[in-house]
Regions:
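Short acidic/glycine-enriched loop/turn segments that link adjacent beta-strands
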Residues: 7-9
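Residues in well-ordered beta-strands of folded domains
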Residues: 2, 14, 68
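Conserved residues at beta->alpha junctions
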Residues: 3, 16, 89-90
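Beta-strand-turn-beta hairpins that frame and shape the catalytic cleft
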Residues: 17-22, 121
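Active-site donor-binding loop signature of nucleotide-sugar glycosyltransferases
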Residues: 4, 115, 121
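Short beta-strand scaffold segments in enzyme catalytic cores
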Residues: 11-15, 119
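Active-site-proximal beta-strand elements of phosphoester/diester hydrolases
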Residues: 1-5, 21-28
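Cap/insert and terminal regions of metallo-dependent hydrolase folds
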Residues: 21, 29-117
Length: 121
């Protein structure tokens, strides 16, 4: 596991099974000082679940809430090798049509989690 940035504490974890690696990095208020440690933790991951509750613009007024942005998840995906990044933990007030518009703008290796999503690693 890896310690994440959340008031009160939180940990990210990874699971390796059948030669595949999955990392869960939610409830983390991402800071650039974490990048090297998170990249090392997610090294050789096939899938990373990323906390993307906010957009970068929304995050400006949500500092201290313990969540990251969609754009930070994209940045992480650009730096973490071949892993697919799944943005999760969406803002509760975000509407499905807003998520659909966000999804259309994401790079190929990044997508949004949704209810009922099943993935095969």
């Amino acid at each position: 596991c890896i310690e994440l940035n959340l008031l009160g504490g939180c940990y990210g974890y990874s699971v390796v099974h059948g030669g595949k690696k999955f990392c869960y990095l939610c409830y983390n208020e991402y800071e650039t000082s974490q990048l090297d440690a998170l990249l090392k933790f997610a090294d050789e991951a096939d899938l990373v679940i990323w906390d993307g509750m906010f957009t970068e613009a929304e995050l400006e007024t949500k500092r201290g809430w313990g969540h990251s942005s969609i754009e930070q998840g994209i940045f992480f995906s650009e730096n973490c090798g071949h892993a697919r990044v799944l943005i999760s933990h969406h803002a509760p007030a975000r509407l499905d049509n807003e998520l659909h518009e966000i999804q259309k703008k994401l790079p190929d290796r990044v997508s949004l989690a949704r209810d009922g999503l099943t993935l095969r690693l």
